[in-house]
Amino acid sequence: MADFEELRNMVSSFRVSELQVLLGFAGRNKSGRKHDLLMRALHLLKSGCTPAVQIKIRELYRRRYPRTLEGLSDLSTIKSSVFSLDGSSSPVEPDLAVAGIHSLPSTSIAPHSPSSPVASVLLQDTKPTFEMQQPSPPIPPVHPDVQLKTLPFYDVLDVLIKPTSLVQSSIQRFQEKFFIFALTPQQVREICISRDFLPGGRRDYTVQVQLRLCLAETSCPQEDNYPNSLCIKVNGKLFPLPGYAPPPKNGIEQKRPGRPLNITSLVRLSSAVPNQISISWASEIGKNYSMSVYLVRQLTSAMLLQRLKMKGIRNPDHSRALIKEKLTADPDSEIATTSLRVSLMCPLGKMRLTIPCRAVTCTHLQCFDAALYLQMNEKKPTWICPVCDKKAAYESLILDGLFMEILNDCSDVDEIKFQEDGSWCPMRPKKEAMKVTSQPCTKVESSSVFSKPCSVTVASDASKKKIDVIDLTIESSSDEEEDPPAKRKCIFMSETQSSPTKGVLMYQPSSVRVPSVTSVDPAAIPPSLTDYSVPFHHTPVSSMSSDLPGEQRRNDINNEVQLGTSSDTVQQ
């Protein structure tokens, strides 16, 4: 089976000339396009080719990718095959022979001594052209030991084509290579069962045929990476690639974001007919790429969340130890941190945490919501921590047990503070504290303002008594200490007053001051507004002309009020 796969990869890397030589050697039709020639050659290989055909395939591949010639037998075999091609009817075969010999590097021909006459003859025959040919670069292995990074949202069910190098087959910039794979009846059944019909005639599959490309590097697991000018065809149909990502800076060439390619919609869901993949790309100096095809099952964010919960919740003591480590005083530092404030709001959804989660690689205590994080990466997989902007892969996520306890104990707090010993306390919002302290103050002020005028209300005509109380201090002239401007506001005003009188009575504070002097002589009552500082100057009432309308009537009312006040004081 390994030999068959190796021969198949060799045939897939052949050019038109090699395919024509192989088909002509096997007695098959060698006319047509490259796609037709390749399908005939693969069918020849699959139908059970003879050992002679297998030797011919290896021989053509050795010419196509020469490395080292081991022994004179290999040289004589190549030499005889080259000369046998001269009498062939194909017009491209002499070119193949020349190309096959010219592609041999000079370092591969070790024997220059007379002990190898065949090699010397070979060198003599091709000496003029051999000196013009430059040494070819080392050919990468067909199946490099490349490992791709695991994709959290996909479970690998089977490997259809293991990682295979995209080998540069010519000196041209644009390269092309073909790959063949077939599905088993069980694989076809799984794909068909998972099919879901979407609006518009589209189909979706949870079991998918996935194509991945990456750099042919074996040092570490590789992320998906596309070569330049990539073009993929599946069974002759062009596969639409993801769009270009915006360049980070001006002048930088745009690149497609590396991600796995779901080619299920173009795959023949039959175990009797093989599938062909054509990949063309622009070669780059110093960069080799690899491709692979897998049968995978797509997962959802809810499934990943369930798997994350099955891993268990991390012990709260781990987080407490991290808190103590952060709050431990550093003797070399002049600044000591005694507490640490942490929010219980998710930085992704700006909502209260439900499943606190963070990565093991993160050094901060702030958590984010696991459900929102998985949903975000399901739409666009970035796996970046929303707190510190560092890599937070799914495999490194943990559920914080300490934050689980805090969320269960405090349901009305959005922020907490950690102490040096690992304990915590809730942080109440300042607005709530201000509301609590301001409510009793409001009650006291309202009671003091509205209760005092009631103590001076006279049983007779209410409206007149209020006006009388306000006009009480018109003729008084004694000095008194100043009151705050806030207490000079008059809350009793008559709608029947004339406009000149209203202008004076607006600043009458007697309704506030009278109750405080009810137990003293009437002579001690502040008689006039002229002794109080006001925010602006106004004409004193005493200086007003007595010719004003109703002035005599007001003087009579003032005398009556003074007598009434004196009598009330005596009765008390």
Swiss-Prot record:
Query: Which modifications occur after translation, per UniProt?
Result: Sumoylated.
- Identify the residues that bind Zn(2+): 362, 364, 385, 388
- Record's superkingdom? Eukaryota
What are the BP-aspect GO terms?
androgen receptor signaling pathway; DNA-templated transcription; negative regulation of androgen receptor signaling pathway; positive regulation of dendrite morphogenesis; positive regulation of DNA-templated transcription; protein sumoylation; regulation of androgen receptor signaling pathway; regulation of DNA-templated transcription
Q: Where is the SAP domain?
A: 11-45
What is the first-listed, main subcellular location in coarse terms? nucleus
Which stretch carries the motif Nuclear localization signal? 484-492
Summarizing the annotation, the consequence of altering residue 390 to R is: No effect on auto-sumoylation
The protein's UniProt keywords, in alphabetical order, are: DNA-binding, Isopeptide bond, Metal-binding, Nucleus, Phosphoprotein, Transcription, Transcription regulation, Transferase, Ubl conjugation, Ubl conjugation pathway, Zinc, Zinc-finger
| PINIT domain span | 134-299
Query: Where are the coiled-coil regions?
Result: none
Phenotypic consequence of residue 383 to A: Loss of promotion of JUN sumoylation; no loss of interaction with SUMO1 and UBE2I
UniProt effect for mutating residue 431 to R:
No effect on auto-sumoylation
Entry GO terms, CC: chromatin; nuclear speck; nucleus; PML body
How changing residue 324 to R affects the protein? No effect on auto-sumoylation
Among Pfam families, the record links this protein to: PINIT, SAP, zf-MIZ
Q: In which tissues is it expressed?
A: Mainly expressed in testis.
The EC number of this protein is 2.3.2.-
Q: Where is this region: Disordered?
A: 523-572
Similarity comment: family membership: Belongs to the PIAS family.
UniProt-listed PANTHER family? E3 SUMO-PROTEIN LIGASE PIAS2, ZINC FINGER MIZ DOMAIN-CONTAINING PROTEIN
Q: What name does UniProt use for this protein?
A: E3 SUMO-protein ligase PIAS2
Q: From what organism does this protein derive?
A: Rattus norvegicus
Taxon lineage: Eukaryota, Metazoa, Chordata, Craniata, Vertebrata
